[in-house]
C-alpha cells in the first residue's frame, strides 16, 4: 500500500483512494484500523457504500471491517447517547425535511436512504442523538433485530 505523508494529498473516501492508486474497489487491499485484519471483498464494498472516511496511521490508509464497525458503533451508542425524538419532531427542531438530513444507521453506520427515513416517519419510530448526530436503523438492521427478538420469544415459550 502506498504511503501518504502529506495530509493535503490524502484521499479520504475509498473510491478516491482507488483512483489515486489506479486500482478498483474489487482489487484494493486495505486493513482494518481496529483489528488490523485485511478486509474481505464484501467488507470493502460495504465500507465504500457506507460512505465512511479512510483514516491514516503513519501515512498508511486504513478502513474498518464490519464486525469492528458494529462493535464500536455500540460503544459509541452507550457512551454518547443523549436523546431520542420522533422524525416529525426532528424536522421541526432542525427546520429541515428528513430527506435532506444525513441520518446514519446506529448499528452499521450506513446512511439511511429516503425509504428508510420514511419508514421511521410512518411507523413513528424514534431517531436517537448519539455523539451529536441523529441515527436510526437501516432496513437490514431493522429486520435482523426483529428476527432476533422473534427467535428469542419462540425459544422462551414452552
UniProtKB/Swiss-Prot annotation:
What's a single GO MF annotation on this record?
PDZ domain binding
Endpoints of the signal sequence: none
**What are the TM regions of this chain, as residue ranges?**
none
Question: Keyword annotations for this protein?
Answer: Activator, DNA-binding, Early protein, Host cytoplasm, Host nucleus, Host-virus interaction, Inhibition of host innate immune response by virus, Inhibition of host IRF3 by virus, Inhibition of host RLR pathway by virus, Metal-binding, Modulation of host cell apoptosis by virus, Oncogene, Transcription, Transcription regulation, Viral immunoevasion, Zinc, Zinc-finger
InterPro entries per the UniProt record, alphabetical: E6, E6_sf
Motif PDZ-binding domain, residue range(s) on this chain: 156-158
Q: Does the keyword Ribosomal protein apply?
A: no
- Show the Pfam families listed in the entry: E6 (PF00518)
Q: Which Gene3D superfamilies match?
A: E6 early regulatory protein
Q: What does this protein do?
A: Plays a major role in the induction and maintenance of cellular transformation. Acts mainly as an oncoprotein by stimulating the destruction of many host cell key regulatory proteins. E6 associates with host UBE3A/E6-AP ubiquitin-protein ligase, and inactivates tumor suppressors TP53 and TP73 by targeting them to the 26S proteasome for degradation. In turn, DNA damage and chromosomal instabilities increase and lead to cell proliferation and cancer development.
Assembly, in brief, is:
Forms homodimers. Interacts with ubiquitin-protein ligase UBE3A/E6-AP and thus forms a complex with human TP53. Interacts with human NFX1 and MAGI3. Interacts with human IRF3; this interaction inhibits the establishment of antiviral state. Interacts with human TYK2; this interaction inhibits JAK-STAT activation by interferon alpha. Interacts with host DLG1; this interaction leads to the proteasomal degradation of DLG1.
Family label:
Belongs to the papillomaviridae E6 protein family.
Q: What is the recorded name of this protein? A: Protein E6
What is the source species?
A: Human papillomavirus 68
Q: Kindly list the organism's lineage.
A: Viruses, Monodnaviria, Shotokuvirae, Cossaviricota, Papovaviricetes
